[in-house]
Amino acid sequence: MNFRLGQPDILLDINDIKDLNFVSESSSSLEIGSLLTHTNAINSNLIKLFFPIISYALKYVAHQTIRNQGTIGGSIVNADPSSEWPLLISLLNAKINVRNKFKEREILVNDFFDSHFVTNIEDDEIVISVTLPKINKYCWAFEEHSSRKGDFAIVETGIILELEDNCE
């Protein structure tokens, strides 16, 4: 809305939906609720344990006030190519769980982003969570450069290398 790309007739504040603010673990994945803030993601023990690249990369998100209020769902729906979350969920082969009044569906990350600032989410849907498949053994790197600390990224890059069992 700051860029005047969207001019909604109605604006809803969904921050009070507590069911969308969580991190949970299953045997094969981590699920992150769409209303989890960047700060809560940075501080999440589960995220630090399974995906330390997230905790590391999110320290680049804007300034503390934005990290305290901005959410994973808002960041990925905005689909800003200079944002950290779209890169992270792409690297981690995420599934985005969306819902409308009638049904829930899962979108693979490669099918979620159509272009810069454009996603494959319908007008009546909201992102409810992101599912990240666990990776047994891997190494990672993330770098971001901006004009000043907290500014939009000029360039960011990341890599995840999954290691075979016999690698060290």
Model-derived segments and spans:
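C-terminal structural segment of proteins
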Residues: 1-168
